[in-house]
A protein has these predicted regions:
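Short beta-strand/loop turn elements enriched in aromatics
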Residues: 189-205
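Fe(II)/2-oxoglutarate oxygenase catalytic core
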Residues: 1-178, 182-192, 208-211, 261-294
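A short beta-strand-loop-beta hairpin characteristic of the jelly-roll/cupin
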Residues: 205-224
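Extracellular structured ligand-interaction cores
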Residues: 98, 174-176, 185, 198-202, ...
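Residues in well-ordered beta-strands of folded domains
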Residues: 140, 178-180, 204, 214, ...
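Conserved metal-binding segment of the jelly-roll/cupin
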Residues: 221-236
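Short beta-strand His + acidic residue motifs that chelate non-heme Fe in jelly-roll/DSBH
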Residues: 188-191, 211-213, 231, 237-243
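A short hydrophobic beta-strand segment most commonly corresponding to one strand
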Residues: 199-204, 228-230, 245-261
Protein backbone atom coordinates (compact mmCIF):
# COMPACT_ATOMS: atom_id res chain seq x y z
CA UNK A 1 0.00 0.00 0.00
CA UNK A 2 1.30 3.49 -0.83
CA UNK A 3 2.65 5.76 1.88
CA UNK A 4 0.95 9.18 2.24
CA UNK A 5 4.27 10.64 1.09
CA UNK A 6 3.61 9.11 -2.34
CA UNK A 7 0.32 10.92 -2.87
CA UNK A 8 0.38 13.71 -5.43
CA UNK A 9 -2.61 16.00 -5.73
CA UNK A 10 -2.45 16.51 -9.44
CA UNK A 11 -4.57 15.76 -12.46
CA UNK A 12 -8.10 14.45 -12.05
CA UNK A 13 -10.21 14.55 -8.88
CA UNK A 14 -8.87 11.87 -6.50
CA UNK A 15 -11.07 8.96 -5.49
CA UNK A 16 -12.85 8.96 -2.14
CA UNK A 17 -10.41 6.37 -0.77
CA UNK A 18 -7.43 8.42 -1.85
CA UNK A 19 -9.04 11.55 -0.42
CA UNK A 20 -9.48 9.77 2.91
CA UNK A 21 -5.82 8.76 2.97
CA UNK A 22 -4.81 12.33 2.21
CA UNK A 23 -7.04 13.73 4.96
CA UNK A 24 -5.65 11.19 7.43
CA UNK A 25 -2.07 12.07 6.50
CA UNK A 26 -2.79 15.77 7.01
CA UNK A 27 -4.48 15.15 10.36
CA UNK A 28 -1.62 12.96 11.57
CA UNK A 29 0.89 15.64 10.55
CA UNK A 30 -1.03 18.33 12.42
CA UNK A 31 -1.40 16.10 15.47
CA UNK A 32 2.33 15.40 15.50
CA UNK A 33 3.07 19.12 15.34
CA UNK A 34 0.57 19.98 18.05
CA UNK A 35 1.88 17.28 20.39
CA UNK A 36 5.48 18.37 19.77
CA UNK A 37 4.77 22.04 20.42
CA UNK A 38 2.21 22.12 23.20
CA UNK A 39 4.99 22.04 25.82
CA UNK A 40 4.61 25.83 25.87
CA UNK A 41 1.29 25.50 27.72
CA UNK A 42 3.31 24.66 30.83
CA UNK A 43 5.12 28.00 30.51
CA UNK A 44 2.00 30.17 30.36
CA UNK A 45 -1.68 29.70 29.44
CA UNK A 46 -1.43 32.29 26.67
CA UNK A 47 1.35 30.36 24.93
CA UNK A 48 -0.82 27.26 25.18
CA UNK A 49 -3.65 29.18 23.54
CA UNK A 50 -1.22 30.34 20.83
CA UNK A 51 -0.56 26.72 19.82
CA UNK A 52 -4.28 25.90 19.75
CA UNK A 53 -4.92 28.83 17.43
CA UNK A 54 -1.98 27.88 15.21
CA UNK A 55 -3.35 24.37 14.68
CA UNK A 56 -6.96 25.45 14.25
CA UNK A 57 -8.19 24.09 17.59
CA UNK A 58 -9.28 27.55 18.76
CA UNK A 59 -10.30 30.77 17.10
CA UNK A 60 -8.10 33.83 17.69
CA UNK A 61 -9.68 36.54 19.81
CA UNK A 62 -8.01 39.59 18.30
CA UNK A 63 -8.04 42.63 20.57
CA UNK A 64 -8.13 44.97 17.58
CA UNK A 65 -9.86 44.37 14.22
CA UNK A 66 -6.80 45.80 12.44
CA UNK A 67 -4.47 43.21 13.99
CA UNK A 68 -4.18 39.94 12.01
CA UNK A 69 -0.78 38.21 12.22
CA UNK A 70 -0.54 35.45 9.64
CA UNK A 71 1.50 33.00 11.72
CA UNK A 72 1.63 33.44 15.49
CA UNK A 73 -0.92 35.21 17.68
CA UNK A 74 -0.40 35.31 21.45
CA UNK A 75 -3.52 36.52 23.28
CA UNK A 76 -3.45 38.88 26.25
CA UNK A 77 -0.43 40.86 25.04
CA UNK A 78 -0.86 44.62 24.94
CA UNK A 79 -2.39 45.39 21.57
CA UNK A 80 -1.57 48.80 20.10
CA UNK A 81 0.12 49.97 16.89
CA UNK A 82 2.96 52.08 18.32
CA UNK A 83 5.15 51.93 21.43
CA UNK A 84 7.26 54.45 23.30
CA UNK A 85 10.96 53.78 23.65
CA UNK A 86 10.60 53.81 27.44
CA UNK A 87 8.34 50.75 27.24
CA UNK A 88 11.12 48.65 25.71
CA UNK A 89 13.75 47.63 28.23
CA UNK A 90 17.32 48.49 27.30
CA UNK A 91 16.43 49.99 23.93
CA UNK A 92 17.06 53.67 24.66
CA UNK A 93 20.56 53.13 26.07
CA UNK A 94 21.46 50.79 23.20
CA UNK A 95 20.36 53.35 20.59
CA UNK A 96 22.57 55.93 22.27
CA UNK A 97 25.54 53.58 21.88
CA UNK A 98 24.67 53.17 18.20
CA UNK A 99 24.70 56.92 17.40
CA UNK A 100 28.44 57.22 16.54
CA UNK A 101 28.05 54.52 13.86
CA UNK A 102 25.12 55.94 11.90
CA UNK A 103 27.33 57.14 9.05
CA UNK A 104 28.76 53.64 8.58
CA UNK A 105 25.23 52.21 8.40
CA UNK A 106 24.15 55.03 6.08
CA UNK A 107 26.97 54.15 3.69
CA UNK A 108 25.52 50.63 3.47
CA UNK A 109 22.13 52.07 2.59
CA UNK A 110 23.60 54.15 -0.21
CA UNK A 111 24.75 51.00 -2.02
CA UNK A 112 21.83 48.69 -1.15
CA UNK A 113 20.63 46.73 -4.18
CA UNK A 114 18.55 43.79 -2.86
CA UNK A 115 14.83 43.98 -3.60
CA UNK A 116 13.17 43.59 -0.20
CA UNK A 117 9.80 42.73 -1.73
CA UNK A 118 11.30 39.38 -2.73
CA UNK A 119 11.52 38.50 0.99
CA UNK A 120 7.71 38.28 1.09
CA UNK A 121 5.75 35.11 0.35
CA UNK A 122 2.43 34.92 -1.50
CA UNK A 123 2.31 38.57 -2.47
CA UNK A 124 -0.66 39.56 -4.61
CA UNK A 125 0.25 40.20 -8.23
CA UNK A 126 -0.77 43.83 -8.04
CA UNK A 127 0.79 46.81 -9.80
CA UNK A 128 1.59 48.54 -6.47
CA UNK A 129 3.68 45.61 -5.23
CA UNK A 130 5.34 44.99 -8.58
CA UNK A 131 6.30 48.67 -8.84
CA UNK A 132 7.76 48.52 -5.33
CA UNK A 133 10.35 45.90 -6.31
CA UNK A 134 12.66 48.61 -7.59
CA UNK A 135 11.72 51.18 -4.95
CA UNK A 136 12.27 49.27 -1.69
CA UNK A 137 15.87 48.14 -1.43
CA UNK A 138 17.73 46.56 1.46
CA UNK A 139 20.92 45.07 2.83
CA UNK A 140 20.62 42.38 5.50
CA UNK A 141 22.94 42.37 8.48
CA UNK A 142 21.14 39.58 10.35
CA UNK A 143 18.57 37.16 8.97
CA UNK A 144 16.97 34.37 10.97
CA UNK A 145 19.54 35.05 13.66
CA UNK A 146 22.48 34.50 11.29
CA UNK A 147 25.06 37.20 10.56
CA UNK A 148 25.43 38.12 6.89
CA UNK A 149 28.70 38.67 5.04
CA UNK A 150 27.99 42.40 5.15
CA UNK A 151 27.70 42.20 8.94
CA UNK A 152 31.08 40.48 9.10
CA UNK A 153 32.60 43.27 7.00
CA UNK A 154 31.53 46.04 9.41
CA UNK A 155 34.02 47.77 11.65
CA UNK A 156 34.74 45.83 14.82
CA UNK A 157 33.30 48.54 17.14
CA UNK A 158 30.01 48.58 15.20
CA UNK A 159 29.81 44.78 15.19
CA UNK A 160 30.25 44.79 18.95
CA UNK A 161 27.40 47.28 19.39
CA UNK A 162 25.07 45.36 17.05
CA UNK A 163 25.82 42.09 18.84
CA UNK A 164 24.52 43.68 22.04
CA UNK A 165 21.24 44.86 20.50
CA UNK A 166 18.16 43.82 22.53
CA UNK A 167 16.90 41.58 19.72
CA UNK A 168 14.07 39.05 19.76
CA UNK A 169 16.20 35.94 19.42
CA UNK A 170 14.04 33.04 18.25
CA UNK A 171 15.54 31.76 14.99
CA UNK A 172 14.64 31.06 12.30
CA UNK A 173 11.61 33.32 12.93
CA UNK A 174 13.68 36.22 14.25
CA UNK A 175 15.72 38.31 14.58
CA UNK A 176 16.08 40.17 11.35
CA UNK A 177 18.19 43.31 11.03
CA UNK A 178 18.62 45.21 7.79
CA UNK A 179 19.20 48.63 6.30
CA UNK A 180 16.04 49.63 4.45
CA UNK A 181 15.93 52.13 1.59
CA UNK A 182 12.67 53.61 0.33
CA UNK A 183 13.07 55.57 -2.88
CA UNK A 184 11.39 58.97 -3.45
CA UNK A 185 7.69 58.55 -4.14
CA UNK A 186 7.65 54.90 -3.04
CA UNK A 187 4.57 53.44 -1.37
CA UNK A 188 4.41 50.17 0.57
CA UNK A 189 0.79 48.92 0.37
CA UNK A 190 -1.09 47.86 3.52
CA UNK A 191 -0.12 44.40 4.77
CA UNK A 192 0.12 42.36 7.97
CA UNK A 193 3.21 40.94 9.63
CA UNK A 194 3.37 37.34 10.77
CA UNK A 195 3.48 37.45 14.59
CA UNK A 196 2.74 39.63 17.60
CA UNK A 197 5.50 38.18 19.81
CA UNK A 198 7.88 40.87 18.60
CA UNK A 199 7.92 44.56 17.73
CA UNK A 200 9.68 46.27 14.83
CA UNK A 201 12.12 49.11 15.45
CA UNK A 202 13.15 51.73 12.86
CA UNK A 203 16.30 53.74 13.59
CA UNK A 204 16.55 56.79 11.29
CA UNK A 205 19.68 57.12 9.17
CA UNK A 206 18.30 59.54 6.56
CA UNK A 207 14.69 60.66 6.97
CA UNK A 208 12.42 63.61 6.24
CA UNK A 209 9.10 64.77 7.65
CA UNK A 210 7.53 63.61 4.39
CA UNK A 211 8.29 59.96 5.13
CA UNK A 212 5.66 58.21 7.23
CA UNK A 213 4.31 54.86 8.37
CA UNK A 214 0.71 54.00 9.19
CA UNK A 215 -0.08 51.12 11.56
CA UNK A 216 -3.66 50.39 12.49
CA UNK A 217 -5.36 53.77 12.37
CA UNK A 218 -2.34 55.76 13.62
CA UNK A 219 0.35 57.53 11.57
CA UNK A 220 3.99 58.11 12.53
CA UNK A 221 5.90 60.92 10.82
CA UNK A 222 9.61 61.48 11.23
CA UNK A 223 10.39 64.73 13.01
CA UNK A 224 14.16 64.35 13.31
CA UNK A 225 16.96 61.84 13.02
CA UNK A 226 17.30 61.45 16.80
CA UNK A 227 13.98 59.67 17.25
CA UNK A 228 13.11 56.00 16.81
CA UNK A 229 9.91 54.33 15.72
CA UNK A 230 8.63 51.16 17.40
CA UNK A 231 5.50 49.47 16.10
CA UNK A 232 3.68 46.15 16.10
CA UNK A 233 3.76 44.91 12.51
CA UNK A 234 1.00 42.38 13.16
CA UNK A 235 -1.26 45.40 12.66
CA UNK A 236 -2.24 46.38 9.14
CA UNK A 237 0.52 48.78 8.15
CA UNK A 238 1.83 50.74 5.17
CA UNK A 239 4.58 53.26 4.50
CA UNK A 240 5.33 55.99 2.01
CA UNK A 241 8.07 58.41 1.12
CA UNK A 242 6.55 61.57 -0.30
CA UNK A 243 9.83 63.48 -0.42
CA UNK A 244 12.30 63.84 -3.28
CA UNK A 245 15.04 62.14 -1.23
CA UNK A 246 15.57 58.52 -0.22
CA UNK A 247 14.46 57.38 3.23
CA UNK A 248 17.03 55.12 4.92
CA UNK A 249 16.46 53.38 8.26
CA UNK A 250 17.89 50.48 10.23
CA UNK A 251 15.16 47.92 10.98
CA UNK A 252 15.25 45.12 13.55
CA UNK A 253 13.06 42.96 15.82
CA UNK A 254 12.71 43.18 19.60
CA UNK A 255 10.54 41.14 21.95
CA UNK A 256 7.06 42.33 22.87
CA UNK A 257 7.61 43.98 26.28
CA UNK A 258 4.81 42.00 27.96
CA UNK A 259 6.59 38.66 27.51
CA UNK A 260 8.33 37.16 30.53
CA UNK A 261 11.86 35.75 30.38
CA UNK A 262 10.44 32.23 30.55
CA UNK A 263 8.06 32.97 27.68
CA UNK A 264 10.91 34.32 25.55
CA UNK A 265 12.95 31.17 26.22
CA UNK A 266 9.91 29.03 25.44
CA UNK A 267 9.24 30.86 22.18
CA UNK A 268 12.87 30.42 21.10
CA UNK A 269 12.56 26.67 21.67
CA UNK A 270 9.13 26.66 20.02
CA UNK A 271 10.42 28.31 16.82
CA UNK A 272 13.26 25.80 16.52
CA UNK A 273 10.92 22.83 16.96
CA UNK A 274 8.31 24.33 14.64
CA UNK A 275 10.89 24.79 11.87
CA UNK A 276 11.92 21.12 12.15
CA UNK A 277 8.29 19.98 12.00
CA UNK A 278 7.39 22.41 9.20
CA UNK A 279 10.30 21.27 7.03
CA UNK A 280 9.52 17.61 7.68
CA UNK A 281 6.19 15.94 8.34
CA UNK A 282 4.57 19.37 8.54
CA UNK A 283 4.68 19.51 4.74
CA UNK A 284 1.72 17.10 4.81
CA UNK A 285 -0.37 19.29 7.11
CA UNK A 286 -2.14 21.20 4.34
CA UNK A 287 -2.71 18.33 1.91
CA UNK A 288 -6.42 18.16 2.67
CA UNK A 289 -6.77 21.93 2.19
CA UNK A 290 -5.12 21.64 -1.22
CA UNK A 291 -7.46 18.77 -2.06
CA UNK A 292 -10.56 20.83 -1.28
CA UNK A 293 -9.33 23.52 -3.68
CA UNK A 294 -9.25 21.08 -6.57
Amino acid sequence: ESSPLDFKIEGSQPSRVKATHIANAANLARRAGFNELQFVKDISPRLGEMVKVLFGLAQPSFSNPLQRPSFIYIPELTSKPFYDIQECEGLKSWIQRLQPFKDELLDIGKVSKSKYVEEFENLPNLEEWNKLRDEWLSTHLIKGGEHSEVFKSLSEPLREVLERAPLAHCPPHAPEMFVSVLEPGAYIPPHYGISNCKLTVHIPLKVTKHASLKAGDEIFKWENEQSAMIFDDSFLHSAKNESDEVRIVLIFDIWHPDLSSLEKEGLAKFMTKFAVWNNGVGKLANLDTQLRRK
